[in-house]
From Swiss-Prot:
Site (Transition state stabilizer): K157, S284
Originating gene: Tpst2
Main localization, broad class: Golgi
Organism of origin: Mus musculus (Mouse)
Entry GO MF terms: protein homodimerization activity; protein-tyrosine sulfotransferase activity
Protein name: Protein-tyrosine sulfotransferase 2
Segments passing through the bilayer: 9-25
């Protein structure tokens, strides 16, 4: 027993001596750097400023802050999942499922900035805006790059990230933003009927949800306009559904990505290598396995309480600002392309395939509920 105690003490002494030796060596090196005038105490440069990933095709992909990231967002239930599935169908693009963590981290960063006391504490501790921004930049890029397969163009779809478009544009100056815009009445009806839990939204009240929708889209739209139309494109869900080819050509031109017919048939690439990866827990998965169709456009009509319909222009003034008629029930969104009419007939007849990895899931989970930060 005594021998083992001696061994422990000896080992601890050796470890302490080693730590002290390392610290002393570091101090000597720092002193030399200061004397040589080469040390900058305020900046550190990482050895590797890029993330390097190897794809299944054995192609090396390099990602950095200067790369043209794509951010897809909007109020939940506005078509963000459809948009990212269409982009995922492009051979050069990978979006993947919602990370859920990125909007939360952005919200924390915003909260620190808004709190004067917390900002002072961070500054006093040396955790300046420059330090925080560098950390946020590295974290967000790491999550986007590594939560899915590598691709030439990376995109992120977390609905609420576009509440921070201005900040993200500063972190990633070559990024582009797609703001999904949908008739708020349709978005809210979808939230309520599909029980999509979103923080702050009372799913028992159309009036409350429309008020919260108005506030959220107002913030996102203002951020989009501030970033500028050369960097942020509002995409109307109704027009994307009615005229997919025309809409997608405009979107890909905006993003600087070559056209590919695969974006018109995202449903054929679900679950396939290099295709569209879907999450079993996102509420829109059972919808985006279908071809683009008219099924969800006007489902909300006749379901909103009369008093809310009467006060719609006051409850949700952003409807009119975005070009929707707050008094039209149902509104006329336009005439669909022939391919969309054909797709709708197929969907109504059940003439579409459920991916093998999702078979049986929808029947088991159709009526289940789970907390969501927001999906669409």
């Amino acid at each position: 027993m005594r021998l083992s105690v001696r061994k422990v003490l000896l080992a601890a002494g050796c470890a302490l001596a080693l730590v002290l030796a390392v610290q002393l060596g570091q101090q000597v090196l720092e002193c030399r750097a200061v004397l040589g005038g080469t040390r900058n105490p305020r900046r550190m440069r990482p050895e590797q400023e890029e993330l390097v990933m190897l794809g299944a095709d054995h192609v090396e992909y390099r990602y950095g802050k200067a790369m043209p990231l794509i951010f897809v967002g909007g109020v939940p239930r506005s078509g963000t999942t459809l948009m990212r599935a269409m982009l995922d169908a492009h051979p050069e693009v990978r979006c993947g499922e919602e990370t859920r963590i990125i909007p939360r981290v952005l919200a924390m960063r915003q909260a620190w900035t808004k709190s004067g006391r917390e900002k002072l504490r961070l500054d006093e501790a040396g955790v300046t805006d420059e330090v925080l921004d560098a950390a946020m930049q590295a974290f967000i890029l790491e999550v986007i790059a590594k939560h899915g397969e590598p691709a030439r163009v990376l995109c992120n779809k977390d609905p609420f990230t576009l509440k921070s478009s201005v900040y993200l544009a500063r972190l990633f100056p070559n990024s582009k933003f797609l703001l999904m815009v949908r008739d708020g009445r349709a978005s809210v009806h979808s939230m309520i009927t599909r029980k999509v839990t979103i923080a702050g939204f009372d799913l028992s009240s159309y009036r409350d949800c429309l008020t919260k929708w108005n506030k959220a889209i107002e913030v996102m739209y203002a951020q989009c306009m501030e970033v500028g139309r050369d960097k942020c494109l509002p995409v109307y869900y109704e027009q994307l559904v009615l005229h997919p080819r025309r809409s997608l050509k405009r979107i890909l031109d905006f993003l600087g990505i070559a056209w590919s017919d695969t974006v018109l048939h995202h449903e054929d690439l679900i679950g396939k290598p290099g295709g569209v990866s879907l999450s079993k827990i996102e509420r829109s998965t059972d919808q985006v396995i279908k071809p683009v169709n008219l099924e969800a456009l006007s489902k909300w009509t006749g379901h909103i309480p009369r008093d809310v319909v009467r006060d719609m222009a006051q409850i949700a003034p952003m409807l009119a600002r975005l070009g929707y008629d707050p008094y039209a029930n149902p509104p006329n969104y336009g005439n669909p392309d022939p391919i969309v009419i054909n797709n709708t007939h197929r969907v109504l007849k059940g003439d579409y395939k459920t991916p093998a990895n999702l078979k049986g899931y929808f029947q088991v989970n159709q009526n289940s509920t789970s907390p969501h930060l927001g999906s669409s």
